[in-house]
């Protein structure tokens, strides 16, 4: 059977695989699809207004062998500048920072407000980026195709910009694109750096994102088209998409994302004869198990945890070189356009609901959700047979995270308090927009202290960190005293969810997991929970 009422769509990722890294040499092997498989993905025959299709002679030969993308940095910059020169509603910008190797990261504002300079307006704010991973060319090409479509249809552009303003970064990771690799130039994965915030480039782009303060966002990727289950099956979806699912996002925002937005994206994909399904990871191939992706540790969570609607777009493309590129770009464009169109068609409802939910989130006494698990069921899932190209409904064990089952909750504290010695923790929280107060008179009072009872050290380093996993704690009440300069993080703020997922040690991507706050069995966790009404 097919589940769509309770599932979202995106990419197939095989967990537990750690690739070896070399500087500027991390391309992936190209998969040469059998003709019977390729027949499932015909050219859509539509006009696309992005550089690879407007200027086909500019596409390098290396795109065909999977060692380059289709659009150079210079052409991307020229394309964006050209659009801005002929459209008063687009402003081309170069930030005051660069990539790790000094490449420009151009971005554009879209607004019909005269003299718009990126400051907040009373309209819906939308954020879009592509090419977080440099070997996923369908991402930035889809973003540029969206801009090109606006340029080519003045009536549509006017309708969209009457109700929304945009910040768009087509190419988040220009170093990765230059080497056609997933990673930053340093070998860090950009989409695994949103919690630990180890790279300056991540912090710089996040600062733009915090300042923009979007209500709706789209993060544009491609997923791997590799054989599965003893080289018998391939993923079948042109595009997979998923709303960011952390349970600490306001339930009304999650309901809107998983209801109206999801349904409209699915309808748009159907209208373009594109296959689609939820974004899943594959923790096991024997038996075949799929889990809906939870993006706490593996994606840009800025908008969702700031109480907004955030969608992940994944098109079938990694390892396919230039195969089906028009179809891949169309799939990505369709998802972007559907999110945008749904937002602007329902702008008043979306804006009001999100702003109201943000205000409620800052004042609620609801419990916080620290960990969750999927609702596991047996079902079938469509795959393509490598043997003959037919689509098969394959039995799978499916982990449904829409919504997930909560398995660890905790009362919302009045605040977290910790020593001024942990300035790095305060800095990383502030980078996400969380307000962190410095207590000039220090702190003395009763707190909830967490004693570490279980903490497992990973046997493999990930990006230089041997993570501490499976953390368990016991809580007790005690009095603590901190001198002047201690930090106070109130839970009465609408970005508090960023603090929850980082400061509660058991959370999947907490600072304790990343050893930003190192812990071992027997330690008292150095961040204390102040019970409500204690200040």
What function would you assign to each model-found segment?
Residues 2-6, 16-535:
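M14 metallocarboxypeptidase catalytic domain recognition
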Residues 10-12:
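Bacterial N-terminal signal peptides
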